[in-house]
Structures are given as C-alpha cells and as structure tokens.
C-alpha cells in the first residue's frame, strides 16, 4: 500500500523498481505474489529476487562423503554462516521447490480459464503466442477426463478471449453424485528451443467449480462382523481384516492395523511447532513463539472417555489435553470408529488470547519406515505454504518422503502440502491408509524421513540421522514462510495463524 501511495498511484511520476523485493533464503519466497500483482500499475517495472542460486562448496567430510559447506565450515571467523544459501536454485543447480512459484508468477503470458474458454493476456513486448501449443483439460476430482490441443495467436501486449468447447458437466459427473471439476489450460513450447524441449510447460491457469447432484444421502457403511471390546486398558474393534485400539491410559489411538500391518508406533502426538526456517530465525520467531515448541510435544492428558456408540457397533473416545504453555490451553482429541474400521478424527483448539501466533497446529504421527509413499489430492506437486500457492496446481500427485525433504542448505521446515482433500500413505506395494478431509474442511500434510525436531537440530544435511521411521503431519493450519527479507521481516499478517482463533483438524482415516 505504501509503495502504491508514494510511487505508483495518481501522484507517481517515475517508473518504480524494487531492488530486492524477495530474499529466497532456505524455505522462503512466500508472499512474492503481493509484489508481482503490482504489475497492474503502468509505472511498476518489477523487482529482483536475491538471488538465483545458493552459494556453497562441496567439502570432504573425511569419511568418504561430501557435504555442501557454508560460512564457518572452513574455520573462517567472522562469517555469515548459511547466509549464502539464498537462491531459487540449490547450489548444485537443481531447482528448489521455490522455483515452482517463481516460474508461474514470472510467466509473460497469463491464462484465466472458465467453463467456456480462456482469457489470454500476452505481456511479452514483441512476440506473439503463435509458436506455442495450448492444451485444455478437464479434471474431475483430480482425474483427467478430457483434453484438447489448440493454437492461439495472441499479439504482444494484447488480451484475447478464446472459446473452448469443454464437455458438459452432466457428461462428466453422475447425476446422483457430486464432484470438483477443474478447467485447466496450459501453454507449452510447440518446438524445441536451445533452453527447453518441445512440450515444456511455460505457464498454466485453472478454474475450479464444485458441482453436486447429490440427494444428501450418506454412503452406507459396508462391514463384516466386528467385535467391540471396551474392557481393559484398551478399547477396540476387531474384524476379520484388522483392528483399531483406543487407549484408556495413553491419550489416543495405539493400534490401526490391517492384515497384520501396523500403522501406529506411538499414538499420534499434538504439534504446535515447525522446524524454524531461515526467515523464522531472521525475524526472531524462535524467541517469540518459543512456547509453541514445547506446548504440543509435552501436552498432558487430563481426561479420557471411551465408550461404545449408541448402536453398539462402534467406539468413540474423547481425550482432553492441556498444552504445555503458560495458560495450559485445552485441546480436545476425539475418535469415533465404525464397524468398517473407519476412524473419524477431530483435534480442536479453542483459541488463546494474548499469545504469539502459532507456527502450526495438528498432529505428528510416527509410522513404520516402509510407509514412505505419499499420494494426495491437493496443491502440488512441490511443497506449498499459505503464502506460496500460486505456482501449484490442484491435482493428484505422488511423492516419496525422501523427495519431499528438500535439501535446504540448513535443514528446516519442508514438505508441506496445502489444501489437501485426501492423502494416501502407503508402502511400495500400496498397503497403508487413506486420510480424507471431513466436515467441509481441507488439511495440510507432509510425509518426511525426519521429525520436526530432527530438522530443527541439524546444521547440515549430512547431520540428519539415518531414517528409521517416517513422520506424518496432519495439520489444520501452518503459517506461511515469508520472504521479504531474512533479517527481520515477519510473515505477512494474513498468512499467520492467530492464537486467539479456534482451529480444528477434521479428517477420516481408512485402512
């Protein structure tokens, strides 16, 4: 607003360039769209990201391995430690997850599709779009159902509306159901260039519409014989294919098993923390939000209620927690399990006045190591955060825990995926579980070889331990990563998680 008022508004007289409007250090480059959106003002000429590539050197560790080293690793004093790691590209010249956002926001052609066509704005100064191939697609609940190729010739500096004969919704969605329909158009290279092969995607646009012909009837639960036992230390439901155990002493679910394959090592734990990013360190987030590091991890159970459901075919359990913060803020975790071993899980935070904004809120779940595949319907394919969503597509994507652990020069928060509708966590054979958003909500998730504390403690990638588990995070919310600078600028207010507002994680778990 200040930039617009002083330089770009009615009183502006000169072109305006932001020398360094984004500092891309570590998991960063959040809020970049707030600056690129200023292109709507004729006097705005853009700005610069600091910078293109991390600066780091390969260093022999003396044990036959190498690591990317930074300030202080060569016994240099004084130094700026990892402050050389501020690139959109990693030091080995591979793209970081931030590149997904930068590429889309810097695209010279803007595509805005809807149900009947696409509006194309060509911001190039000299070249038309004649040499590009445009592909239109329709996805229903993330699955491509139709596509067609087009050649649109939009002159430089022009905006043109092009009609597209997308299929009718009634031809795609059953009249007795509901779905999320995504209309997508992308621009690709029709021929190879010196810098990219034919078919390389330059930019894309999506429009998402929710359609429903549903009569409101709930899906029937299909289940065989189930044995419900509420006596002893655990209450459980046992079937011929699996079991769910809800502890009366441990504060949650202690077994979630199908065909002998266990998904729980310890009951899922509350989390109100994330491994600090470089921007978090630079703006003092660790000091300001120190209480949240321990609040979830050391929360204590203050009440437990486990009983059969009214029909006698299921179980429900409510666990009351106190966070380990100054006010002992209450959190409620509720499980309800039906005869098909479908678990409805909610985690509710009521809000706490006069507290620093939360880094994150939800659950962190330790899984056996073999469950290292993540397939999800949400924003991807790369990691996304509340202030870094514009480069992501809505679709179904497959990742591994190792792939999602971005090798930032200093280990930190990584791998988060926003606006997730469902996620499947499986082994190499497809065995595992599915997490589905419930209650009209979305959730954020990550699956990594390391816990948040492991990432927080390591100073280099080679200091992370040998993976022995995978760590699943299911979050109601996580704050953005920021990116204005790495020496004081906070995450913009609209991308923080206010402590005085209620939060609720609402999901269904299925084996």
Protein language model features and the residues they cover:
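Conserved structural-core and active-site-/substrate-pathway-adjacent residues in large, well-folded domains
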Residues: 20, 47, 102, 120, ...
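Extracellular and select intracellular beta-sandwich modules with Ser/Thr-enriched
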Residues: 146-148, 200-205
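Extended substrate-binding grooves/exosites of carbohydrate-active enzymes
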Residues: 1-115, 119, 123-130, 135-137, ...
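Beta-strand-rich binding/interaction modules
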Residues: 118-153, 160-165, 176-190
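Glycine-centered small-residue hotspots that permit tight backbone geometry or close packing
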Residues: 71, 87, 199, 379-380, ...
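A generic structural motif
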Residues: 46-52, 149-151, 375-380
